[in-house]
Amino acid sequence: MAKKSSIEKNNRRKRMTGNAAAKRARLKTIIADKTKPMEERFAATLKLAEMPRNSSATRIRNRCELTGRPRSNYRKTKLSRIALRDLGSRGLVPGLVKSSW
């Protein structure tokens, strides 16, 4: 089980990303638009740099929904390999069958 503070920190980052996504996208389009004057694009760059780092989507870590484990996660199920194997062996994941040949 991961530390509760790490899980909560990641949840806070998810919330901040959701709140600031529209503003961040608007600033990025201004920066990328070459038809706008250089001063306006530079001002947008400064505003983007002033925004909190945790409002960026790249700061979010994929974690297991059950255990909070940060590594070896399957995106489709949002579970770590350990949790997926445990739930799969108990028959709690639909469509997952233990392999035998």
From Swiss-Prot:
Reply yes or no: does the keyword RNA-binding apply.
yes
| Cross-referenced Pfam families | Ribosomal_S14 (PF00253)
Single GO MF descriptor: structural constituent of ribosome
Asked whether the keyword DNA-binding is assigned, the reply is: no
Name the InterPro entries on file: Ribosomal_uS14, Ribosomal_uS14_bac/plastid
Tell me which UniProt keywords the record has, alphabetically. Answer: Ribonucleoprotein, Ribosomal protein, RNA-binding, rRNA-binding
GO (cellular component) term, any one: cytoplasm
- Spell out the residue ranges making up region: Disordered: 1-23
| Quaternary structure (record) | Part of the 30S ribosomal subunit. Contacts proteins S3 and S10.
Any idea what this protein is called? Answer: Small ribosomal subunit protein uS14
Organism equals Nitrobacter hamburgensis (strain DSM 10229 / NCIMB 13809 / X14)
